[in-house]
């Protein structure tokens, strides 16, 4: 078996391939670090008034929380 006259991967081609394969990974890692730094540097508000979760209606039955009306087609309960 004869070897090709021009090698498929020469020294220049290898460094070129390594550069173009490592560049997207390095760029993605850099952007992820910058994004995480941005998220962690934001001050969290102690009183988030726009986030208000009222869990009491979930622990009560519908008759206790005043949600007694039924929707059309829901007279007997859930039908799967």
Swiss-Prot record:
Ranges that cross the membrane: 16-36
Localization, UniProt: Membrane; Nucleus
Any one biological process term the GO annotation gives: white fat cell differentiation
Gene that encodes it: Adig
Induction field: Induced during adipose conversion of 3T3-L1 cells. Up-regulated in 3T3-L1 adipocytes by troglitazone which stimulates PPARG expression during differentiation. Down-regulated in 3T3-L1 adipocytes exposed to TNF-alpha and to retinoic acid.
Modified residues (Phosphoserine): 63
One Pfam family per UniProt: Adipogenin
One GO cellular component term noted in the UniProt record for this chain: nucleus
Tissue specificity comment: Selectively expressed in adipose tissue where it is particularly enriched in brown adipose tissue. In adipose tissue, expressed exclusively in adipocytes and not in the stromal-vascular cell population. Expressed at much lower levels in heart, stomach and muscle and barely detected in kidney and lung.
Organism: Mus musculus
Function field: Plays a role in stimulating adipocyte differentiation and development.
InterPro entries noted in UniProt: Adipogenin
Membrane topology reported for the UniProt record: Single-pass membrane protein
Main location: membrane
Name of the featured protein: Adipogenin
Family: Belongs to the adipogenin family.
Keyword Nucleus set for record: yes
Keywords, in A-Z order: Membrane, Nucleus, Phosphoprotein, Transmembrane, Transmembrane helix
Organism domain of life: Eukaryota
PANTHER family, per the entry: ADIPOGENIN (PTHR38499:SF1)
């Amino acid at each position: 078996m004869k070897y090709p006259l021009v090698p498929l991967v020469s020294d220049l081609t290898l460094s070129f391939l390594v550069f173009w394969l490592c560049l997207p990974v390095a760029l993605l890692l850099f952007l992820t670090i910058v994004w995480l730094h941005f998220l962690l540097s934001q001050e969290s508000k102690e009183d988030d008034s726009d986030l208000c979760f009222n869990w009491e209606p979930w622990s009560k039955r519908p008759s206790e929380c005043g949600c007694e009306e039924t929707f059309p087609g829901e007279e007997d309960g859930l039908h799967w």
